Every structure is written in C-alpha cells, then in structure tokens.
From Swiss-Prot:
NCBIfam families, per database record: TIGR01440 family protein
Pfam families documented for this protein: DUF436
UniProt similarity note: Belongs to the UPF0340 family.
Protein name: UPF0340 protein SAOUHSC_02355
InterPro entries for this protein: Antibiotic_NAT-like, DUF436
Length: 174
C-alpha cells in the first residue's frame, strides 16, 4: 500500500512517533477496500498494515495499540509489557474478525504477548476509516494534517495531544 507507506514516512519526518510512546491505531479494513465499515473486513489488508507499523516501531521505538470495533466496546489490544494496572483494566475478550475487527484480530494473533484492555489514554493515534479513536487520546487532542488523506479508500484522521492550558487570563504558558 503505497499511500500507507507515504503516510508513515511523512509522520516519521514530522517526528510524530516518539520512542516509548504508545500510538493508537483504529482501522476499518472494510473502508480501506472501499466497503462500509464493519461489513467485509480483510485479514490480508490487516497483515499489510500491521507489518508496516511493525517496521515503524522498530525504526522509532514507538509501540502500537490496536482499537477493536464497537462490538467489543472499542477495547484495545496491547503488548502485556505495556500494561499498567493502575491506569488500565484488562478484559476477557479475544478480538475476532466479526467482533473486534480484522486489524485488532491480526494484531492479537501476531503480537508477542497480547492482552486486551477496556480503555487506554495515549498521546497520539492514527484513525484509518473513521473508527472513532478520540475516546482514547489524551486531552487535549490536536489534529495532525498530512498530505495523505486516505489509505486505500479509507479516510485518515491523525491526532496528537498537548497539555491542558489551565488558570485563566493571568496564567502564563510555555
């Protein structure tokens, strides 16, 4: 997928991926192939996307988390090494193509030691196909603009975050 490679290269050039961070991926493989979200799914597309992200992870030190679909309440597949019991709650579900989505399913099958958590708060994310990842992005969510607007037929939305500005008119900010 040339557009995926271009998108990831552009984000690397922008220093979007930071070593030690967790970047959330939401993806409708149905949308990537031009179908309605949640209808046909593609493990082949999931494999391509997962493998491209794995390369980015090795190059930059970022870790990826994978959002499941609404049928599993948009739960997140992560490596167990990223699990923090103080801020995350593990849930008992295994993503499936028809309840979790193809990419979360593929990730669960190919990660070293995957677990699924109910919620996560991450500093950045890539939404491929309007899967609504915003509920897992740290406040304050900030859109990131790139020249790549789609992966396949799916609309891409990218977000990062910044600290909240609090204190009112007398406050000073960095």
């Amino acid at each position: 997928m040339k557009d995926l490679t271009m998108l990831l290269d552009e984000l690397k050039d922008m220093s979007f991926f930071n070593k030690g961070d967790i970047c959330l991926i939401g993806c409708s493989t149905s949308e990537v192939i031009g179908e309605k979200i949640g209808t046909v799914g593609s493990m082949e597309v999931a494999e391509t996307i997962f493998n491209a992200l794995d390369v980015v992870s090795k190059e930059t030190g970022v870790t990826f988390a994978f959002q499941g679909c609404e049928h599993i309440n948009r739960a997140i597949t992560i490596e167990k090494s990223q699990y923090n019991p103080l801020t995350m709650e593990e849930v008992s579900v295994v993503p499936d193509v028809h309840a979790g989505g193809s990419l979360a399913t593929y990730a669960f099958q190919h990660m070293k030691d995957p677990i699924v958590v109910e919620h996560i708060t991450v500093p950045c994310g890539i939404d491929i196909g309007q899967t609504l990842i915003g509920m897992h992005i740290k406040h304050v969510c900030v859109p990131v603009r790139t020249s790549v607007k789609q992966v396949g037929q799916a609309i891409v939305t990218i977000a990062t975050s910044r600290p909240k500005k609090i204190g009112g008119e007398r406050a000073k900010y960095q």
